[in-house]
């Protein structure tokens, strides 16, 4: 499945996302050119009892957001409701490749050319978050210096606090 919002999409909208539901697998997707995020999983504040849970995104291409902040996606669940990101390519997003809160597995992914907003953003919230981060590759792209710091100064992992356990 290919989802490409493009320049004619509504400003501030994600190319694809999940607000509620359970037991979903998104496989072999290409999600690009979002006007805010490319692919996000966020609970719907209008349905607090029906948060997304047990969701997997795998073998997918997520990238090339169009807005100036160009984001891969927000993956925000509770500490009990998990999301697995497995064997994906996050490419050419300035930030949020992804930004995660809650229960998350980030395994065997590639993040290329993450810009100055950070590659894997860890929580930055008071909410307890737990992540299993294994065997990922972070590849310096055209907007990064070879020392792993961006032109703006961000390393691959950012915004860690005491509420985020990896």
Give the ranges of each region predicted by the language model.
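Acidic/polar loop patches that form or flank catalytic/metal-binding clefts of enzymes
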Residues: 118-119, 143-148
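Extended alpha-solenoid helical-repeat scaffolds
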Residues: 152-157
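Charged/polar, low-hydrophobicity segments characteristic of intrinsically disordered regions
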Residues: 135, 148-150
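Right-handed parallel beta-helix
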Residues: 1-7, 14, 20-36, 45-75, ...
